[in-house]
Amino acid sequence: MAIFDNYEVWFVIGSQHLYGPETLRQVTQHAEHVVNALNTEAKLPCKLVLKPLGTTPDEITAICRDANYDDRCAGLVVWLHTFSPAKMWINGLTMLNKPLLQFHTQFNAALPWDSIDMDFMNLNQTAHGGREFGFIGARMRQQHAVVTGHWQDKQAHERIGSWMRQAVSKQDTRHLKVCRFGDNMREVAVTDGDKVAAQIKFGFSVNTRAVGDLVQVVNSISDGDVNALVDEYESCYTMTPATQIHGEKRQNVLEAARIELGMKRFLEQGGFHAFTTTFEDLHGLKQLPGLPVQRLMQQGYGFAGEGDWKTAALLRIMKVMSTGLQGGTSFMEDYTYHFEKGNDLVLGSHMLEVCPSIAVEEKPILDVQHLGIGGKDDPARLIFNTQTGPAIVASLIDLGDRYRLLVNCIDTVKTPHSLPKLPVANALWKAQPDLPTASEAWILAGGAHHTVFSHALNLNDMRQFAEMHDIEITVIDNDTRLPAFKDALRWNEVYYGFRR
């Protein structure tokens, strides 16, 4: 995905006319230098665009108003180069509906000990200008991020870049359309929820489309297009004998390709970037979409099974966040456990739909195997193991009065044995701090059995996501202890109860 090319972040300098035109000229000069350097050297995901100085209430209000109405603007980075009285910012910040980051930096890194004078002090006032800006943010109860560090510092670059990913993701989410092919898996609770509340909170819309409408598009795909896509399969994957030309399951592969092309066309025509399916609503489809869903996820689409629109939306959001980063992000499900003293493990998978972006194999296996659930023809699927190393699993749940994001930090490990009779992609991990604590905390907090699994993102990314969307986050990691975790759940209940 080249989604960051569609957005820019505005760089706004706060000052005032008290210091005279020469000081403001130097402020502008410094700002131009910093923005050019950051765009050239900081490896930021999208471009910084310098805006005119904000030196009066009207100028600041105009910048904020323009940011709201510019679809390319993903957010504002504000630098208080000099002191900028914060009452000037009230009207602008009141109307601002884009993410905001305060870059608490200054042009010089070291103090010029021998030459420092009051002119230098008046020009370089971030130390207390930033505090004035911080006060008005706190007074207005306005969520904004703060990054402190010199503008040439790589850690500051990384933090700004991480925030930019969140800002772009938030703007993308406001336009996100989730398509549900069929409804919720019958009688399942956690995959359901309030779609109106979700659209109010996050911006994404969720609507159902009839499977019959999808089938009509699938059936319109030409044999030539199907054969061309299967040629791509053969170059990208290791085909089992049954799936090769003249193999007994070759027709199933052709049908999977037809479904993939039909699904993609349907999603593109409807402007959808996330979708769900359910094995209980497949009328007219010859097989449960496995391979098609896997490949669409790898192309950046959000997905979840059984009508789970919240996880599908979260996957799309996290796909956008992680664009260009190392490691993959996938739909996942905690499936079964391996209990062994000191080596408890979780085997994650799903019936078919795990994204190849997390595969360790360069060429996953493409196979067709029997699947009793759904009552359709044997579906095609990609089979692979997962990369090892630190990862997270995240779940977004609807508690009725609010949304809760659960994040468990995990360590993925190599599968110690082959799985000859398990023809699905899988991931094996150790939950932090340990399986009993992690699973009990997850259950107590109401976490879903569906998650988004990511090697590319980390806990800090998800904390930023929760803060930017003003939702509760519950963390399970090596520092988690159940008594304190239970207390935190109780405190959160009181805190969010007061905010209703």
Curated annotation (Swiss-Prot):
Homohexamer. Pfam families: AraA_central (PF24856), AraA_N (PF02610), Arabinose_Iso_C (PF11762). GO terms for biological process: L-arabinose catabolic process to xylulose 5-phosphate. Belongs to the arabinose isomerase family. This is L-arabinose isomerase. Disulfide bonds: none annotated. Mn(2+) binds at residues 306, 333, 350, 450. It comes from Shigella flexneri serotype 5b (strain 8401). Its EC number is 5.3.1.4.
